[in-house]
Design a protein with these regions (language model features):
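Helix-rich, well-folded core regions that mediate interactions or catalysis
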Residues: 1-176
Length: 176
């Protein structure tokens, strides 16, 4: 119905509205958070991206801007969206706490991590990484990506309280 559609849109814009501001500050912040996740959970990939001047993660921009709409077939996109949005309100395991407040970033990290070996071994420049990442569209298995994303959430959660300490903003994403 129209009212439910409207309020769903309002909720989505509260979550994603910063992605669409003219100065792109919201997207820059998202990419910075993703960069920090890469540094924490995929340090070899982080070092490689640093070496090829790819830490801006612009090759992930489209993923985050349109919430993976151009990366998967529609049925898979809907499953990914459902997982991303329901991760904020997971009640089964976490007594009402969310699994994760930024599941979309863990989905992006899951895609990167699943191709980390190939990227490190065969791609020599930022342009090659960009072309490779864009070539993944409609070639990825959504179930595998979601499983890996969830595992990454738990991996980050398990590091909280250990040395070296996890960045506070990353910590708050998985321990709400």
């Amino acid at each position: 119905d129209e009212a439910r559609t409207f309020w769903t849109f309002v909720a989505l814009m509260r979550m994603w509205g910063s992605h669409y501001v003219a100065d792109q500050s919201g997207m820059r912040h998202e990419l910075l958070l993703l960069q920090r996740l890469v540094a924490e959970l995929c340090p070899r990939l982080y070092a490689y991206l640093q070496r090829i001047d790819g830490l801006n993660l612009f090759f992930c921009f489209r993923w985050l801007l349109v919430c993976f709409k151009r990366e998967f077939v529609l049925d898979d996109v809907l499953r990914i969206w459902d997982a991303m949005w329901s991760a904020r309100w997971s009640e089964a395991e976490h007594r009402g706490w969310p699994l994760c407040t930024h599941m979309h970033l863990f989905v992006a990290l899951a895609i990167l991590e699943s191709h980390e070996r190939l990227i490190l071994r065969y791609l020599a420049s930022f342009d090659e990484v960009l072309m490779f990442i864009h070539s993944l569209a409609f070639q990825m298995d959504a179930t595998s990506v979601l499983r890996r994303a969830e595992a990454l959430v738990y991996r980050l959660r398990s590091r909280v309280g250990q040395e070296p300490p996890v960045d506070e903003e990353l910590r708050s994403m998985v321990l709400c």
